[in-house]
A protein has these predicted regions:
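Long, contiguous, secondary-structure-rich segments that constitute the structural scaffold
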Residues: 1-15, 78, 82-98, 102-177
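Long, low-complexity segments enriched in small/aliphatic residues
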Residues: 1-87
């Protein structure tokens, strides 16, 4: 990536860190971007409030949980490059679904067991992980594992403005695999 051209492995190893973006190979990088202004006619940021658009699909009796998808630290995006890194795979070797510990106990599951996460679009088998950072009533799946394609489970309904699918909110259920 051109934006990383001035941040080499050698530089990271010798300096410990480099602020991004770095405009030259020996420059410190920009700690604060847009310090001298934003790329607008006034130089000020343009902040536009939006109206809240409710999700297209809400939890119900059949699918009482909310599935949200996202990234994980060890595998970037789809894992196309990071899944080949032995060190990263050693830290996160398999697809997981994270759930609040109270939900795990309330629903009779145990940490580490194989579960099936299902939405109206399909189902995927994963290992269950307890995570207090996941809101009760929600499931979190990273989308980087090809063997457990999280975004195949999400609602394809597009946001009316951004034209982005609802990757962050899909009605779901979980059961023993």
């Amino acid at each position: 990536m051109r934006s990383l051209d001035n941040i080499s492995w050698e530089r990271l190893e010798s300096e410990g860190f480099v602020c991004y973006p770095a405009k030259s190979q020996d420059g410190p990088g920009e700690e604060i971007i847009f310090y001298s202004g934003f790329p607008t006619p006034t130089g000020r940021a343009k902040i536009v409030p939006t109206e809240l658009v409710p999700p297209d699909e809400l939890p119900d009796e059949d699918f009482p949980l909310v599935l949200t998808t996202g990234r994980m630290l060890e595998h970037w995006h789809t894992g196309a490059m990071t899944s080949r890194a032995k060190a990263l795979n050693a830290q996160e070797p398999e697809a997981v679904v994270s759930m609040h510990p109270k939900d795990i106990g309330r629903m009779g599951f145990t940490r580490g067991q194989k579960v099936m996460v299902e939405t109206r679009r399909g189902e995927v088998t994963l290992t269950l992980r307890a995570d207090r950072d996941v809101t009760p009533g929600m499931l979190f799946m990273p989308f980087c594992f090809t063997e457990a394609p999280a975004n195949f489970l999400t609602n394809p309904q597009l946001d009316p403005y951004g034209k982005i699918p609802e990757f962050k909110f899909s009605a779901a259920r979980i059961r023993q695999a």
